[in-house]
A protein has these predicted regions:
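Hydrophobic alpha-helical transmembrane segments
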Residues: 1-175
């Protein structure tokens, strides 16, 4: 049974990637429940604001950082592992696994956001290109010129290809 699932991994990843490329993360779903990556970010942010205090020693901060890691990663990993184990007994469990991997991919979203920047730059519209880039970077773009905006879009594309496509596929492949 367990060996059979390993032959299904490429199919599971292909289904998840295809869903993301074709559908992305639908706006209606995002409006109603948000996005799993956003949920995890909120958990991390909560721990950061609760535990990362200037008055704590470096040793305490490191210990609290490790605690944050385990309180964030362990429950998510445990739940994912339990779900995967339950799905192994279902004939079409691989489809459900693909549906569970799909939200962690950002292929269509990344393409759309970077294309919005490129389209605005093609029209020589710095205001629109700054606005489009501000949706994918966290820096101040008030005085950004065309080269800075283009560089920011390329940098974001590179980083987010790793974070939003390669890493989720890699970890899904391993686990």
């Amino acid at each position: 049974m367990y060996s059979e699932i390993y032959f299904m991994i490429p199919l599971i990843l292909l289904i998840a990637l295809t869903l993301d490329i074709v559908i992305g993360w639908p706006e209606k779903i995002y409006e109603n429940i948000g996005h799993p990556v956003t949920w995890i970010g909120k958990v991390i942010s909560y721990f950061e604001h609760s535990l990362n205090k200037r008055e704590y020693s470096k040793k305490s901060l490191k210990l609290l950082g490790v605690l944050t890691f385990f309180l964030t990663v362990f429950p998510i990993t445990a739940v994912a592992f339990l779900i995967e184990q339950m799905l192994l007994s279902f004939y079409y469990g691989f489809v459900i696994q693909a549906l569970l991997i799909w939200p962690f991919l950002a292929t269509k979203s990344l393409y759309t956001h970077v294309k919005d920047v490129a389209d605005a730059l093609d029209k020589k519209d710095l205001i629109a290109s700054r606005a489009a880039l501000s949706r994918i970077v966290g820096r101040d773009l008030k005085n950004s010129d065309e080269n800075t905006i283009c560089g920011g879009a390329i940098e974001s594309l590179s980083e987010n290809t790793s974070d939003g496509i390669i890493a989720p596929l890699f970890w899904a492949f391993l686990f």
